[in-house]
């Protein structure tokens, strides 16, 4: 006989009523299940963190301004939504027309070809092309509601003053995805404002957008590519670069924004399911988990095994992984822990895990092998993961000093104005100071005073040179940044640096007023670098003395040869 029943029987014999025991037993089991269920929000904050975020917003000017900016961007749409709830959802790019609510899309030569099937609800429209075009979407107010054709009104990026034009669906570049990302980002931000303030108008707005996206994605099968233009036939077949619903898995980012709307507005979402889910007897949590896992499962066998494609691929998958329940909640045993193990410990034939990712960094220089934009975009992504992974019980910084070295490797490649050097297919611009914010949070939490001083110095320099402002932190900054940046002494910069892999030398003299700097680039093939002979560039007063060619327009545009005078920037020499 089961010992539990023997115990109950004996208690009953001693005069304790069976009903009370069973009630206590059921209550205890319910408490155990409640402990096992995932609380929300859970990715960047827990429910108990709301008070500290509110205090930060109230007491710190930068946080108050950052929160006000988030709220102001969404509130006009939220207020309209109370009387006109279809206005925003009708602007999602969907297959709206009954009879053409496709459940299966096909691509050909890396462009949308045709669709099949007809779902009981509108389904999410697939982007028209893998490549981009010269247009951006007109403002939301000017977009076509319930757009049945997929043709998009666009503004010429090269000449924005021109009248807008209607761009055919199959020539729409990234306009479809950009439209849906914009609207889901509004939902994400509104969900955050709801979590902070408790104002349900923000939750309703976020929920209505999320629900239309969720049921519209639920009825979609992964795209098919019969001619393997993206590396496989698509569907669930491993290999190639297609995502669940984009030509490139690293661009399959609708799920990132949807996952955060789900996380912040979870309690409201669960109470307000889409009418169609109620009609088919399904609940929001079950369907959301299924949809999130589709993006993850496709992502795990697509994209790139190494390099920035691998890191960017994990970046798409991480948030939906973290909003899942624990393994035992799912019939296939694949919940949060299962998927995180593949990121943190276990490389696969399709994706390197973090230990193998970190082997890519040069142990001496701390540099990633690709050009500057990719090098520091990659370490930024890794450090972006640090806070949510630590909340999930995983510290990726403590045992990996190369990750900290990689973040600091940006300094030799910055000029005095905190701009990045330019070579290969990088586009320059300011360094990403969020890298240092992430480290400041970590070092503060681990009481690493030396680390705090180094990254605080970089942040203070960016602020003093007006290259960085915490006022633009966004909700991730409000959740994770320290309340203040300590005042510390300025860090001295390296006089010279050399990367044999990149064939790149920097030399600096920042002691005087001129802030002089010199770079010499040799170039090589691959890694987003360019084998263009020797290129010299001179800087003074914190600026390049002549314009650099920077990156090309796109991967698909032709190369252009150029040459300047001996004193010009990026003079190309034979060799």
What role is predicted for each listed range?
Residues 2-3, 17-21:
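Positively charged n-region of N-terminal signal peptides that target proteins for export
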Residues 5-9, 25:
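Aromatic (phenylalanine/tyrosine) cluster motif
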Residues 23-32:
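Bacterial N-terminal signal peptides
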Residues 33-37:
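Sec/Tat signal peptide C-region and signal peptidase I cleavage site
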Residues 38-168:
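Low-complexity, Ser/Thr/Pro/Gly-enriched N-terminal "stalk/linker" regions
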Residues 45, 50-55, 62-65, 369-575:
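Extended polysaccharide-engagement surfaces of secreted carbohydrate-active enzymes
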Residues 151-176, 233-244:
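Internal amphipathic alpha-helical repeat/solenoid segments
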Residues 176-408, 414, 427:
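Aromatic-lined, polymer-binding surfaces characteristic
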């Amino acid at each position: 006989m089961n010992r539990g029943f023997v115990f109950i029987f004996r208690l009953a014999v001693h005069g304790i009523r069976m009903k009370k025991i069973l009630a206590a037993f059921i209550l205890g089991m319910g408490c155990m299940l409640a402990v096992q269920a995932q609380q929300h929000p859970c990715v960047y904050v827990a429910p108990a963190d709301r008070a500290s975020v509110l205090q930060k917003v109230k007491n710190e000017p930068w946080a108050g301004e950052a929160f006000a900016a988030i709220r102001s961007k969404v509130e006009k749409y939220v207020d309209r939504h109370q009387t006109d709830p279809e206005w925003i959802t009708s602007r999602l790019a969907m297959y709206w027309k009954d009879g053409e609510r496709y459940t299966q899309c096909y691509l050909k030569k890396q462009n949308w070809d045709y669709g099949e099937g007809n779902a009981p609800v509108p389904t999410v429209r697939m982007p028209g092309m893998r490549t981009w075009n010269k247009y951006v979407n007109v403002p939301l107010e000017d977009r076509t509601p319930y757009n049945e054709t997929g043709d998009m009104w666009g503004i010429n990026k090269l000449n924005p003053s021109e009248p807008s034009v209607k761009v055919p669906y199959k020539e729409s570049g990234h306009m479809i995805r950009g439209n849906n990302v914009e609207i889901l980002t509004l939902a994400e931000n509104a969900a955050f404002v709801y979590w902070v303030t408790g104002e349900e108008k923000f939750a309703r707005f976020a929920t209505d957008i999320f629900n239309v996206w969720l049921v519209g994605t639920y009825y979609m099968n992964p795209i098919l590519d019969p001619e393997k233009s993206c590396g496989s036939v698509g569907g669930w077949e491993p290999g190639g670069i297609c995502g669940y619903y984009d030509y490139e898995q690293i661009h399959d980012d609708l799920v990132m924004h949807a996952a955060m709307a789900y996380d912040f507005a979870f309690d409201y979402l669960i109470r307000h399911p889409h009418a169609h889910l109620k009609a088919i007897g399904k609940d929001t949590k079950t369907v959301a988990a299924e949809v999130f896992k589709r993006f993850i499962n496709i992502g795990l066998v697509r994209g790139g095994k190494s390099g920035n494609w691998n890191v960017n691929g994990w970046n798409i998958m991480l948030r939906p992984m973290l909003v899942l329940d624990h393994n035992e909640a799912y019939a296939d045993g694949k919940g949060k822990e299962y998927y995180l193990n593949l990121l943190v410990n276990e490389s696969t034939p399709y994706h390197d895990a973090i230990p193998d990712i970190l082997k890519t960094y040069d142990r001496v220089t701390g540099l990633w092998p690709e050009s500057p934009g990719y090098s520091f975009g990659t370490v930024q992504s890794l450090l972006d993961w640090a806070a949510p992974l630590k909340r999930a019980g995983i510290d990726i910084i403590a045992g990996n000093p190369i990750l900290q070295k990689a973040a600091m490797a940006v300094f030799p490649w910055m000029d005095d104005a905190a701009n990045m050097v330019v070579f290969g297919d990088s586009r320059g611009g300011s360094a990403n100071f969020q890298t240092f914010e992430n480290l400041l949070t970590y070092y503060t939490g681990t009481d690493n005073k030396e680390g705090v001083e180094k990254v605080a110095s970089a942040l203070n320099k960016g602020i003093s040179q007006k290259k960085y402002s915490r006022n633009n932190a966004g909700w991730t900054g409000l959740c994770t940044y320290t309340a203040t940046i300590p005042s510390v002494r300025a860090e001295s910069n390296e006089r010279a640096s050399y990367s044999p892999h990149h064939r790149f030398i920097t030399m600096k003299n920042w002691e005087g007023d001129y802030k002089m700097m010199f770079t010499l680039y040799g170039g090589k093939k691959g890694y987003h670098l360019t084998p263009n002979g020797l290129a010299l560039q001179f800087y003074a007063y914190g600026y390049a003395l002549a314009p650099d060619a920077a990156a090309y327009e796109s991967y698909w545009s032709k190369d252009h040869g150029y040459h300047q005078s001996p004193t010009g920037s990026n003079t190309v020499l034979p060799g």
